[in-house]
């Protein structure tokens, strides 16, 4: 079971201006966003990542660069169009306070499965291609690096919310109940029977429990169970810290 860490890009210049950026060019992290990306990179530094996959948009590339810079190893970096921002079409580049007056706004809020942006894509199509991309990448990474592999997908708010909703078995019409902040960390572990959502929209906390255990030489090594922990379980075992000299 590989593990994917979903990271939303840090705060962007469009976020600060109250603009729905979509896929328009020229949107990058602002000063706060760069600091957020660096902080998230430091938080993930304890976890040896095998790959950092990013949306092709600049704000995500900048966030991915900060995560890679904090790694002691050299995780592979790649771009995945399947996790790019929703194509908001004619809504792109417009002020959110203006868009809130549009009839479609209420549909986006209450029945997103029926929302299709004029000149763009539907939210159902966005979820379908994002979930397919994450699951495909996860399976490929596990096949290459083994079930203990941990990787990062740097993407966008609505995209990450839709992936989390799928993992939780939620209908897309309920996905607005999920909140995903800039530079936040959410964690999913896919298995043959079900996905496990290990964390959602976190900003702090130790992540050393994601570090894979040392490889065993025995061919009889047990694969991690895909069963849920009835009663909740004891939680992850922390990685012992190195003794101080």
What kind of region is each of these model predictions?
Residues 38-106, 240-245:
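Phosphate-coordination/substrate-recognition cap region in phosphate-metabolizing enzymes
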Residues 104-125, 222-225:
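Short glycine/proline- and acidic residue-enriched helix-loop micro-motifs
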Residues 3-9:
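Short, hydrophobic/glycine-enriched beta-strand segments
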Residues 4, 147-155:
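Generic beta-sheet signal
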Residues 10, 157:
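Active-site metal-binding loops of divalent metal-dependent hydrolases
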Residues 45-48, 137-149:
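Glycine-rich phosphate-binding loop signature in dinucleotide/nucleotide-binding domains
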Residues 11-67, 116-132:
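Loop-to-helix element that buttresses phosphate recognition and phosphoryl-transfer chemistry
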Residues 2, 86-97, 143, 147, ...:
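Acidic, low-complexity terminal tails and accessory targeting/binding regions
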């Amino acid at each position: 079971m590989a593990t994917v860490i979903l990271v939303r890009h840090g705060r962007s210049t469009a976020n600060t201006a109250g603009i729905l950026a979509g896929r328009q060019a020229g949107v990058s992290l602002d000063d706060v966003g760069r600091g957020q990306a660096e902080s998230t990179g430091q938080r993930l530094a304890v976890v040896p990542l095998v790959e950092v996959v990013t949306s092709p948009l600049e704000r995500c590339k900048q966030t991915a660069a900060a995560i890679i810079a904090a790694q002691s190893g050299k995780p592979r970096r790649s771009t995945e169009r399947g996790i790019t921002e929703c194509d908001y079409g004619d809504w792109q580049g417009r002020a959110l306070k203006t868009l809130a007056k549009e009839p479609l706004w209420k549909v986006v809020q209450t029945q997103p499965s029926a929302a299709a942006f004029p000149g763009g894509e539907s939210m159902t199509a966005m979820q379908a291609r994002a979930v397919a991309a994450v699951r495909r990448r996860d399976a490929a990474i596990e096949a290459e690096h083994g079930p203990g592999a941990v990787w990062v997908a740097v993407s966008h708010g609505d995209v990450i919310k839709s992936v989390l909703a799928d993992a939780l078995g939620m209908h897309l019409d309920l996905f607005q109940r999920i909140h995903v902040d800039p530079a936040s960390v959410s964690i999913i572990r896919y298995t043959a029977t079900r996905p496990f959502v290990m964390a959602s929209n976190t900003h702090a906390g130790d992540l050393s429990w994601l570090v894979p255990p040392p490889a065993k030489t025995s061919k009889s090594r047990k694969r991690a169970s895909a069963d849920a922990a009835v009663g909740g379980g004891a939680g992850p075992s922390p990685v012992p810290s190195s003794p101080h000299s």
